[in-house]
Every structure is written in structure tokens, then in C-alpha cells.
């Protein structure tokens, strides 16, 4: 099954927690990474089947738009990332995310 990665980046913490919550509720995806991108900018990444990641990112973007004062910085969905990308960048499933893998 083709696996994708989707990432949303926002200004501030409240919109990213809203996005993360909406993403895992809307689709069969697993949060693989969350963190501080730079000054007050946060990101969340999910993995799962391509169509599920697309659905999750759409739901996350909607949640950001509905969060008062939220600012979307950027987002992306990458279907079937190359093995080299998975190996070098921290987008793969981790020991923490594996129990929640769909």
C-alpha cells in the first residue's frame, strides 16, 4: 500500500494542536513527528495511506482556519516519499508512534 507523509506548519501552538487532533480524527493516519520549526512556528507530520493523508491534511487545514488568531505558514502532502528521504529525514514511524500506526 502506498504510504504518504503530510505536514502542516502554523504560527503558534493552539492551531497545531487543533490540526493534529482533527487529522487523526478525520483519517486513518498516525502522527509521526511534532515540534518547533522556528520562533513560535510549530509543525505536525502524519503518515498513512495516500488518500488518508490527503483527507487528514484537509481536515487539519480546516481546523487551523477555524482556530481564532491562527496563521497557517505552510503545508505539504508527499505521496510515496523516496526511501532516501525516509532514511535521512525524521518522517518515518518511531517507537513512540508505532503503537498508534493504522
Swiss-Prot record:
Alphabetical UniProt keywords: Bacterial microcompartment, Carbon dioxide fixation, Carboxysome, Photosynthesis
Disruption phenotype: Single deletion has a wild-type phenotype, a double ccmK3-ccmK4 deletion has slightly larger, aggregated instead of spatially separated carboxysomes, and has a photosynthetic affinity for inorganic carbon between wild-type and carboxysome-less strains. In another study single mutant is wild-type, double ccmK3-ccmK4 mutant has impaired growth rate; ccmK3 does not complement the double deletion, while ccmK4 does.
A single GO cellular-component term on record: carboxysome
Induction entry: Carboxysome size and components vary with growth conditions. When grown in ambient air at medium light (50 uE meter(-2) second(-1)) there are 15 units of this protein per carboxysome, the numbers are stable under low light and high light, and increase under high CO(2) (at protein level). The CcmK3:CcmK4 ratio of 1:3.8 is stable over all growth conditions.
Highest taxon of the lineage: Bacteria
Residue ranges occupied by any BMC domain in the UniProt entry: 4-90
GO-annotated biological processes: carbon fixation; photosynthesis
Molecular function per GO: structural constituent of carboxysome shell
Practical applications: Heterologous expression of 12 carboxysomal genes in E.coli (ccaA, ccmK2, ccmK3, ccmK4, ccmL, ccmM, ccmN, ccmO, ccmP, rbcL, rbcS, rbcX) leads to the formation of bodies that resemble carboxysomes, have densely packed paracrystalline arrays and RuBisCO activity. These structures open the door to generating carboxysomes in plant cells to increase their photosynthesis and productivity, as well as tailoring bacterial microcompartments to specific metabolic needs and molecule delivery. The absence of ccaA, ccmK3, ccmK4, ccmP and rbcX leads to less active RuBisCO.
Predominant subcellular localization, coarse grouping: other
UniProt cross-references to SMART domains, sorted A to Z: BMC
Xref: InterPro entries: BMC_dom, BMC_shell, CcmK, CcmK-like_sf, CcmK/CsoS1_BMC
Spans traversing the lipid bilayer: none
Family: Belongs to the bacterial microcompartments protein family. CcmK subfamily.
PANTHER family: CARBOXYSOME SHELL PROTEIN CCMK4 (PTHR33941:SF13), PROPANEDIOL UTILIZATION PROTEIN PDUA (PTHR33941)
Its job: A non-essential, minor shell protein of the carboxysome, a polyhedral inclusion where RuBisCO (ribulose bisphosphate carboxylase, rbcL-rbcS) is sequestered. Hexamers form sheets that form the facets of the polyhedral carboxysome. In PCC 7942 there are several CcmK paralogs with presumably functional differences. This subunit probably only makes heterohexamers with CcmK4. The CcmK3-CcmK4 heterohexmers have been suggested to cap other hexamers, perhaps to alter metabolite flux.
Subunit structure as annotated in this protein's UniProt entry: Interacts stably with CcmK4, probably forms heterohexamers with a 1:2 CcmK3:CcmK4 stoichiometry. Bulky residues in the pore region probably preclude the formation of homohexamers by this subunit.
HAMAP family reported in the protein's UniProt record: CcmK
Protein name: Carboxysome shell protein CcmK3
Organism of derivation: Synechococcus elongatus (strain ATCC 33912 / PCC 7942 / FACHB-805) (Anacystis nidulans R2)
Amino acid at each position: 500500500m502506498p504510504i504518504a507523509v503530510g505536514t502542516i506548519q502554523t504560527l503558534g501552538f493552539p492551531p497545531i494542536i487543533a490540526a493534529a487532533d482533527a487529522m487523526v480524527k478525520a483519517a486513518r493516519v498516525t502522527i509521526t513527528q511534532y515540534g518547533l520549526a522556528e520562533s513560535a512556528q510549530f509543525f505536525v507530520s502524519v503518515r498513512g495511506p495516500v488518500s488518508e493523508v490527503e483527507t487528514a491534511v484537509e481536515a487539519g487545514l480546516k481546523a487551523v482556519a477555524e482556530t481564532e488568531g491562527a496563521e497557517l505558514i505552510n503545508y505539504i502532502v508527499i505521496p510515496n516519499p523516496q526511501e532516501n528521504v525516509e532514511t535521512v529525514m525524521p518522517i518515518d514511524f518511531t517507537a513512540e508512534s508505532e503503537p498508534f500506526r493504522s
